[in-house]
Amino acid sequence: MGHIKREGVFIIKDLETLKVVADPVRNQIMEVLEKKPQNVKEVADKLGLAPSKLYYHFNMLEKVGLIQVVETRQVANLIEKYYQASSSFIDIDPTLLNFSTAE
């Protein structure tokens, strides 16, 4: 598991998750989703980006557990997913940043 949650804090425990969170667009997405659940189009409108440019980022964030689907709605013949940030705060496990020097 690449993360643990502690009292509203998402703790990153692996490099894959750290790389995902390091992306500026993904940071913006998480900031928007911290406030309330929204779908990809709503987030895209807030960020001034095309929804098609965000699907990859949403998938990466969901894959590592930084965001989650909290609601689905049927709109005509489409299903809209509403996402929310998993936690309000992110921290990095200090052991992930420990570098040993072998001699």
Which residue stretches match the model-derived regions?
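A short acidic, leucine-rich amphipathic alpha-helix
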Residues: 42-48, 61
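Conserved segment of winged-helix/HTH DNA-binding domains
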Residues: 18, 64, 74-103
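Short coil turns linking two alpha-helices in DNA-binding domains
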Residues: 50-52
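Short, Lys/Arg-enriched N-terminal segment that forms or immediately precedes the first helix
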Residues: 3-18
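Short helix-coil-helix linker/hinge
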Residues: 19-26
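Short capping segments at the starts of secondary-structure elements
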Residues: 24, 35-42
